């Protein structure tokens, strides 16, 4: 079986500053993985390279493969990357919705990667695509808001619309870049539970960048910690220690980053809740 994600020797430099350094990573189909680390550690940069939204260095840049297909190598994107992106759902921190469009129309945009360009440019969605979008909205609890303008939704609701768009896209790999960074605790919990449910029930590979370690421990079996463009930890999220996190986050480490007994209990409760769904 092909790896869902394979990264080898990935290097990225911005203005002579290394953002990713000889990075290697393998993720198996159906895994849910948290990328953690302080701001500027390379989490979002790595995620963008996985989706082919950024190119690695041309000299010794490395290689990225998703679902057994090459996304990029040595600073050059695969000429067929648009087709590959149809299998990669990308969820942005700031939602990336079209505010003037309805919730349903935003979700239907997930179909564009599998449509002829002429039909997509005219927004000619068929009944099967519309039904699929409504099923996705039902799953994230927003079917009753399908006709509402996206601009009227709360941040948590907009992020759930973005998840529904990825479901409508029928993506095999979902990449979520700080999806809960700007959300209140209840909205953050709901977004993470939806992503975990998609991973568990649908077998989708989910990679999520998180600044909040307690959410990583609660919802992601595996964690990969980055610091200064290098991987410093790759293992079970529950094995992350307070000492390691203090070293990882440095001056940014505070009570919200620490794994407490309470967060461990909440994690177990969340897993039990998901098992009953």
From Swiss-Prot:
Where ATP binds, per the record, is at: 37-44
Reactions that this protein is recorded to catalyse: phosphonate(out) + ATP + H2O = phosphonate(in) + ADP + phosphate + H(+)
Tell me which Gene3D superfamilies the record gives: P-loop containing nucleotide triphosphate hydrolases (3.40.50.300)
Q: Which GO terms describe its cellular component?
A: plasma membrane
* UniProt-annotated location(s): Cell inner membrane
Q: Which cysteines are joined by disulfide bonds?
A: none
Keyword annotations from UniProtKB, A to Z: ATP-binding, Cell inner membrane, Cell membrane, Membrane, Nucleotide-binding, Phosphonate transport, Translocase, Transport
- GO molecular function list: ABC-type phosphonate transporter activity; ATP binding; ATP hydrolysis activity
Domain named ABC transporter: residues:
5-253
Q: Per the similarity annotation, which family is this?
A: Belongs to the ABC transporter superfamily. Phosphonates importer (TC 3.A.1.9.1) family.
The name this protein carries in UniProt is Phosphonates import ATP-binding protein PhnC 2
């Amino acid at each position: 079986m092909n790896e869902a994600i394979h990264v080898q020797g990935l290097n990225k430099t911005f203005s002579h500053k290394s953002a990713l350094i000889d990075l290697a990573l393998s993720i198996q189909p159906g895994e849910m993985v948290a990328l953690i680390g302080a701001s500027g550690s390379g989490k979002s940069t790595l995620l963008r390279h996985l989706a082919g939204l950024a190119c690695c260095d041309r000299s010794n840049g490395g290689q990225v493969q998703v679902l057994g297909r090459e996304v990029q190598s040595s600073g050059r994107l695969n000429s067929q990357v648009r087709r590959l992106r149809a299998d990669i759902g990308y969820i942005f921190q700031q939602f990336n919705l079209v505010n003037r469009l309805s919730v349903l129309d935003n979700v239907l945009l997930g179909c564009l990667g599998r449509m002829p360009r002429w039909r997509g440019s005219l927004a000619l969605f068929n009944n099967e695509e519309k039904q699929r979008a409504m099923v996705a909205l039902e799953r994230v609890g927003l079917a009753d808001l399908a006709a509402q303008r996206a601009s009227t939704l709360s941040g948590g609701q907009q992020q759930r619309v973005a998840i529904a768009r990825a479901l409508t896209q029928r993506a095999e790999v979902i990449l979520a870049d700080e999806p809960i960074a700007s959300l209140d605790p209840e909205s953050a919990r709901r977004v993470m539970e939806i992503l975990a449910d998609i991973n568990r029930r649908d077998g989708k590979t989910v990679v999520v960048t998180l600044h909040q370690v307690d959410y990583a421990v609660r919802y992601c079996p595996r964690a990969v910690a980055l610091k200064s463009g290098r991987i410093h930890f790759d293992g079970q999220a529950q094995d992350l220690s307070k000492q390691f996190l203090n070293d990882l986050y440095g001056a940014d480490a505070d009570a919200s980053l620490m794994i407490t007994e309470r967060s461990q209990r909440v994690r177990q409760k969340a897993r039990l809740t998901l098992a009953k769904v």
